[in-house]
Amino acid sequence: MSYLFDTDAISEVLRHRPSKVYLRWLAAIPREEQFTSAVVTGELYKGAYQYAARELHLRSIEERVPPVVTVLPYDVAVSRIFGMIRAHLEEAGLIIPDADLQIAATAIYHGLELVTGNIQHFGRIPGLRLNPVLARSRSASPHRRG
């Protein structure tokens, strides 16, 4: 099984005190089965630029994300899936932010299971396989602080 890590799943690893349950699970996943999306890295960079300690956060992303997970591009094939999902959800009266739909489309196109802490949110996207390990690890450690 191969996985695409959502922004919150990558952010968890970058936290000062990440979930030990999540880190143990992640350590068992071979490097070649770990992916994220260029959309996720964009969200991470946006967050870094919002911090006063911008350079520290930027360096953390650059040193700890691309060397560890394969960053998949957002391309024409993925954008077609995005368009299909977006149209389907709009017809159903559901609105999900475009970045999340782009991340989901990347996972669907590449046949990857999405690791996210936001199962309810992404669960509305047809054809998307979700992995609840991050959400479960958070419920196992409700008093964890960053």
Where on the chain are the PLM-derived regions?
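Generic structural signal for small/hydrophobic residues in well-ordered secondary structure
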Residues: 6-7, 44, 82, 107, ...
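Short, well-structured N-terminal submotif of metal-dependent ribonuclease cores
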Residues: 1-36, 48-64, 91, 136-144
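Short, structured coil segments at secondary-structure junctions
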Residues: 30, 67, 125-126
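Active-site neighborhoods of divalent-metal-dependent phosphate/nucleic-acid chemistry enzymes
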Residues: 70-117, 143-146
